Amino acid sequence: VGDPDRVPEVSRHFDTIHKKIRNREFEIHIGKLGGHDILAMSTGMGTDNIDIVMQELDALVNVDFSTMEAKHEIKSLKIIRLGTSGSIQPHISVDQILLTDFAISMDNLHRHYVLKRKFENYEMELFPFLGMVHVTRADADLLNQFQSHKTLLGNTLTAPGFYGPQGRKTRLPLREDSIIEKLS
């Protein structure tokens, strides 16, 4: 989750909570759910914060800190990011749960990594000033695990900022005033 105050909203569904840790913007609750170890953690907003969290969680289980080298046996973590999002579609209400089918990335974080797992990826030009944006399709098996009559399937957009990149204007003029309307 992004907001540290939302971690208890997730961990209250755990069978047990063994430990609670808070440092700066990170709130972590560690426990058990259905016999499995589970962790709820805040990441803060934005892909830059999520990048830090993903790297550091991976390092905790896959790096030998005495040598700073990868361990011989690599573990794979199952990470599910829960977050809040605005909607540009009027039929989607504030309290609805949306599962992301396609994720559109307007930032450039994805360009810094080589992924071994193959996802359905696309590059497309939305606006000339943005250059190419990256579109990734969600894993179909994972979507099927969570899809129900209580969820909607839709697309989400990751913007590299809260104001201009999402069409919000304060005092600075925007290069594209109607970016959200054009995306919808």
What are these regions (language model features)?
Residues 1-134:
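Metabolite-binding pocket within alpha/beta catalytic cores that recognizes anionic/polar moieties
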